[in-house]
Design a protein with these regions (language model features):
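Proline-rich intrinsically disordered, low-complexity coils
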Residues: 18, 30, 118, 125-126, ...
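Charge-patterned, long linear interaction tracts outside catalytic cores
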Residues: 168-190
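Polybasic low-complexity intrinsically disordered regions
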Residues: 3-102, 115, 175-181
């Protein structure tokens, strides 16, 4: 159990909330917020998760309004025993933040292996671009494990849209769903 949680993957997904005001209070969900992803606006919550790289199991779940940026939640998703942390480009600069965890409990420095944006790769000379793309592909293939958890929650459990109002209820529901997803993922053959 000593090697568990040494290599972590952090990621988040948007859980939509009904934006309709056709209810008794004529109001939208007060804790849900809007966010633009690509060219599409979403209204709802964000589920931030920390996943063990080797087992693919979720160890930390944090739920916020959708407008909370990924990098803000990085330190809350880490256990303190990490040696390396993988994340998408939303976590760029996580190691430079004031609240970032730079050393684990053993005193070793934590390596943040965050995917770069494609525009950052194109800025380099063409000879170096091939090597950088290969490195980014390796990071992405490791990071893909977290998407399996989201596939179970959103696909198998069909929890793409919230059924409750309020952050407390969303947190309770998503904690339960990710725990159930862990049971499903732990039961699959390797």
């Amino acid at each position: 159990l000593g090697d568990v949680y040494k290599r972590q993957i952090v990621d988040s997904t948007i859980i939509a909330a009904p934006s309709s005001t056709k209810n008794q209070g004529k109001q939208r969900d007060p804790d849900a917020h809007q966010v633009k992803k690509g060219n599409t606006w979403h209204f709802g919550y964000k589920a931030h998760v920390g996943v063990d790289k080797d087992t693919g199991l979720v160890h930390t779940v944090e739920v916020t309004g959708a407008n909370t940026h990924d990098v803000v939640m990085t330190s809350k998703l880490l256990t303190g025993d990490e040696e390396s942390v993988y994340g998408d480009s939303g976590y760029l600069g996580a190691d430079k933040r004031e609240d970032s965890i730079r050393r684990n409990r053993q005193g070793r420095s934590i390596r943040y292996r965050i995917n770069r944006r494609p525009s950052q790769i194109r800025k380099n000379p063409t000879r170096a671009q091939g090597q950088l793309k290969c490195r980014e592909h390796e990071k992405s293939s490791i990071r893909a494990k977290v998407e399996h958890v989201f596939a179970v929650v959103k696909g198998r459990f069909r929890y793409r849209k919230t059924r409750y109002r309020g952050l407390r209820k969303q947190t309770a529901k998503l904690n339960m769903l990710f725990a159930l997803a862990n049971l499903i993922l732990a039961d699959r053959p390797c």
